[in-house]
């Protein structure tokens, strides 16, 4: 069972396609993958990241010149898993268009902002949230110090990524991510996290 199936509670519709060779059944996510649509749903974690990365690489091999559409509805999750997806988005040749449906928080927001310039969207009632990475560690004082320094280094890295994709000064990013910072679509456009709020597909959708 893949992560999208698990996120849907194990209930995933099956669609039937008719062709000259007869009928063929697809789960809905596999059918949408044929249209170069990838769903990033739920917590960002290693298993989900591996599947998203595999789909990105597969679609690149299918057609390196055609856009990939990444639909995001995520509260965030592991920084390392999120950065693995982010790095792959930047690495592959096709543009990755991002679209927030529902929410894109924490690493979800960074992945939304990391889409191809001019191709980052959200739907009208989506919520987007940026903040600094969370961390907690117990152990010897020296180990706690090591982990504290790592969290600060990760925070700086994430802030630089957001500054790069939003065009905001790094100093403003540092202030704005100090606490949970929620935005609606229009605020996210003004901030530079996305390029447009889509009301309908006719308005220029992914």
From Swiss-Prot:
Keywords attached to this entry:
Cytoplasm, Hydrolase, Protease, Serine protease
Q: What is its main location?
A: cytoplasm
**Active site residues according to the UniProt entry:** 106, 131
A GO CC annotation recorded here is:
cytoplasm
EC number from the UniProt entry:
3.4.21.92
| InterPro entries linked | ClpP, ClpP/crotonase-like_dom_sf, ClpP/TepA, ClpP_His_AS, ClpP_Ser_AS
UniProt keyword Hydrolase, yes or no: yes
Q: Give the location in the cell.
A: Cytoplasm
Gene Ontology MF terms: ATP-dependent peptidase activity; ATPase binding; serine-type endopeptidase activity
Signal peptide region? none
Which reaction equations make up its catalytic activity?
Hydrolysis of proteins to small peptides in the presence of ATP and magnesium. alpha-casein is the usual test substrate. In the absence of ATP, only oligopeptides shorter than five residues are hydrolyzed (such as succinyl-Leu-Tyr-|-NHMec, and Leu-Tyr-Leu-|-Tyr-Trp, in which cleavage of the -Tyr-|-Leu- and -Tyr-|-Trp bonds also occurs)
> Does this UniProt record's set of keywords contain Protease?
yes
Record-level GO BP terms: protein quality control for misfolded or incompletely synthesized proteins
What is the documented function of this protein? Cleaves peptides in various proteins in a process that requires ATP hydrolysis. Has a chymotrypsin-like activity. Plays a major role in the degradation of misfolded proteins.
Q: How does it assemble?
A: Fourteen ClpP subunits assemble into 2 heptameric rings which stack back to back to give a disk-like structure with a central cavity, resembling the structure of eukaryotic proteasomes.
Q: What is this protein called?
A: ATP-dependent Clp protease proteolytic subunit 1
Q: Which gene encodes it?
A: clpP1
